[in-house]
Amino acid sequence: MSPLPSFLTSPPPSVGVEITSDRVTAVSLSRQASGWIVSAHGTERLTSGVVTPGLNAVNVHDARALSAALRSAFDKLGARPRRVALVIPDTAAKLSLLRFDKIPAAAELDQLIRWQMRKAAPFKPEDAQISWVPAAALPGGGREFLVTLARRDIIESYMRACADAGAQAGVVDLASLNLINAALASGDTTAGDWLVVHVAPDYVTLAIVRDKEVIFFRTRQLEGDADLADLVHQTAMYHEDRLSGATFARVVLSGASARGADAPADAAEKHARLRRGLEERMGVKVDALDFRGIAAMRDRISAGPDLLDALAPAVGVVLRERVA
């Protein structure tokens, strides 16, 4: 699989950071003889209104509060990082799959992709930040391309918050893409198509992966658990009718424990309830995304779903450049 798209790249950092509408999380990974280790992590809550993710509106409303939360999370790592890989909410950007039945020449491909995305952007073309990678091959020699579009000033506002906290963001990426990175890096070899369900505080993203390539990606606002079950059912029907799919070989759920839960016990129950509801609706086993197959937790025998959910995107963005 080609690396999933990133807005900005440079040599990979060993610290991943995720910013959501209600918290910031920092994770430090280290390489040991036994493999990758989550050597430290820290989370700080954000008060309502500090960050409100969106494609075409101000996202960071209180830069000082966001930077302070990032500094507090960095302090919990033991040493403040100078460089980080940054994960931002899916709703801060637009991700599309562009299809070319005949792949243009390399000199034209980038221009065509950028032209198509800028044409559909709800803001001035010159304000667009665009990143793309090859995705699934098509019969007859064509290919899909996974393209991410965002407003440049929105991306820069998240990066600036990190810089004000003392860390440069060498990589900027989306949350759900890095859940996929974490799942792929964990080495599951299940044959067939699989579904990733990412439940954030204010949205849900559904992604379908086939042969390690994203073939479907949809982000929607989420009002309640019933809406989630309906969206998953609709996605399963689309998968069968339009993508020539059968029953999903694997369904991975992440983030459910953080939605509406105020304590670890609440988080575990929330995750279990959503998982059972999806299993009943789909008739398929639903697993929590567990990255510990590739990055073990240091000095921790077990980790609850709330912790795994909180760390997974930041772990995924660190592993994306390090695990084939």
Enumerate the predicted regions with their spans.
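Hydrophobic/aromatic-enriched cytosolic interaction surfaces used to assemble or bind macromolecules
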Residues: M1-A324
